[in-house]
Amino acid sequence: MNGPALQPSSPSSAPSASPAAAPRGWSEFCELHAVAAARELARQYWLFAREHPQHAPLRAELVSLQFTDLFQRYFCREVRDGRAPGRDYRDTGRGPPAKAEASPEPGPGPAAPGLPKARSSEELAPPRPPGPCSFQHFRRSLRHIFRRRSAGELPAAHTAAAPGTPGEAAETPARPGLAKKFLPWSLAREPPPEALKEAVLRYSLADEASMDSGARWQRGRLALRRAPGPDGPDRVLELFDPPKSSRPKLQAACSSIQEVRWCTRLEMPDNLYTFVLKVKDRTDIIFEVGDEQQLNSWMAELSECTGRGLESTEAEMHIPSALEPSTSSSPRGSTDSLNQGASPGGLLDPACQKTDHFLSCYPWFHGPISRVKAAQLVQLQGPDAHGVFLVRQSETRRGEYVLTFNFQGIAKHLRLSLTERGQCRVQHLHFPSVVDMLHHFQRSPIPLECGAACDVRLSSYVVVVSQPPGSCNTVLFPFSLPHWDSESLPHWGSELGLPHLSSSGCPRGLSPEGLPGRSSPPEQIFHLVPSPEELANSLQHLEHEPVNRARDSDYEMDSSSRSHLRAIDNQYTPL
């Protein structure tokens, strides 16, 4: 593994190379060296972890993936640079070509170590007698003139000639040639940045256009390079579009990367292996790779460049919260039923307490109900309830929220983030408030991967209702308002237009003490369906009362005249 393995070793060095028997084939050869490399890598892994406790330890799988990528790159480079000049490594073991047998034996000449370092085998060959001018000779001359040498190779050639005679050392820089006279820029240039990782991926820019029309995936080449900087070598991330382009479309230093993380299933439900890259003062970019191995490899590389470990990200996603409802005493699967409501009376995280007052006054906010319950609420009527939604607290990320909506009979979940000022972020769009976000998705379709065929707009929402004490016969009854603008909701009309709403600004009857599900009894998601006689009496009683009267019961009135109970006219009422 440490030497050029494809070159045949000399008979004198073969017995001392290894006490074991020589491998009988390439498979045994690869297995022998893989075992040795794995043993050495594991030893160095534990040694580095003990000597550098300040670095967060990476899992062995991520280390092996990164080691495999780097090993393949450096191994191919060593084999390419270490083989004999003018010979392909695939010709190892074959006899010399036929032309070599007919060629005359070269006479004794200067030894090979005395020659200056060159880039091709033509300069290592002995001088040939001048022949007639031909096209091949002219092409070789032009190739020699226009050949570009990096800046690092010019001192090496001078150093290689230094151990020889003083005449040779002085003769090398004394022959500038035509290239130095007429083409001085072709002799030296800045060395190209070293490629640490490179692959062709699909990417999408998370901007306003992509949010309105859906994600537009493009093919590009993502390259992670090590470039020289004023404070030492720095790592640079470059995106080339098209992939074979020589100039990057986007370029950013790894020090300017603010966040790199996996995309959750809520953000990319139809794309499994995606990660998002957030660069300072740039548009967020979503990348998609082919499989999980490539995803973990890229995440390990980028996390190492930014100085953020992967363990903290994974712990945030997978560690369950001790304050999660219905999870402290029994598993989630055994308690997720419609007969058990969430209990918001317990203590919440400080992050939840800072942002809950922005949403607690609205009837579409259901608090800490589970993902299964939210899905059951929005998909009760199947495809007929297309666009019905509710907002709830996130189960896995405390302090964040989820927009659950019905898409052709299937529940979809979209994660929301709120700042301390009430500003809302959905995927990569920012809104002044959650209400502005809901109005946006009422007018514009929610972007899904399937494009125009998956058009879904928010049409109505499920209202939070509570179960009266002492009631035992209940029927699942989600309320929904097909027209939920400020004109159709006299009780919440002024509040829906507010970008930020504190708990003190809740309308009368909807204060935190009087909110359904916010009082001392636990929140329930049921409602009693009254008898036809009671509904008729309620209609007669409501005709003589003012329209703007505060709500006295849990029944929601129609938006036009407020004279019809939503329990009758609601097209989403289950039979």
UniProtKB/Swiss-Prot annotation:
Phosphoserine PTM positions: 13, 103, 120, 150, 330
Keyword terms of this UniProt record: Diabetes mellitus, Phosphoprotein, SH2 domain
Protein's UniProt keywords contain Phosphoprotein: yes
Compositionally biased intervals (Basic and acidic residues): 83-93
Keyword Phosphoprotein annotated: yes
Family annotation (SMART domains): PH, SH2
Gene Ontology CC terms: cytosol; plasma membrane
Ranges of biased composition (kind: Low complexity): 95-104, 152-174, 325-337
UniProt PTM comment: Tyrosine phosphorylated by LCK.
Domain SH2, first and last residues per copy: 364-462
Molecular function via GO: protein tyrosine kinase binding; signaling receptor complex adaptor activity; stem cell factor receptor binding; transmembrane receptor protein tyrosine kinase adaptor activity
Gene Ontology biological process terms in this record: cellular response to chemokine; cellular response to interleukin-3; embryonic hemopoiesis; erythrocyte development; hematopoietic stem cell differentiation; intracellular signal transduction; megakaryocyte development; monocyte homeostasis
Region annotation (Disordered) ranges: 1-23, 83-136, 150-176, 322-346, 503-525, 546-575
Pfam families listed in its UniProt record: Phe_ZIP (PF08916), SH2 (PF00017)
Tissue: Preferentially expressed by lymphoid cell lines.
Domain PH: 194-307
Family: Belongs to the SH2B adapter family.
Function: Links T-cell receptor activation signal to phospholipase C-gamma-1, GRB2 and phosphatidylinositol 3-kinase.
Entry's disease: Celiac disease 13: A multifactorial, chronic disorder of the small intestine caused by intolerance to gluten. It is characterized by immune-mediated enteropathy associated with failed intestinal absorption, and malnutrition. In predisposed individuals, the ingestion of gluten-containing food such as wheat and rye induces a flat jejunal mucosa with infiltration of lymphocytes.
PANTHER family reported in the protein's UniProt record: SH2B ADAPTER PROTEIN, SH2B ADAPTER PROTEIN 3
Self-association and partners: Binds to the tyrosine-phosphorylated TCR zeta chain via its SH2 domain.
UniProt-recorded name of the protein: SH2B adapter protein 3
Annotated organism of origin: Homo sapiens
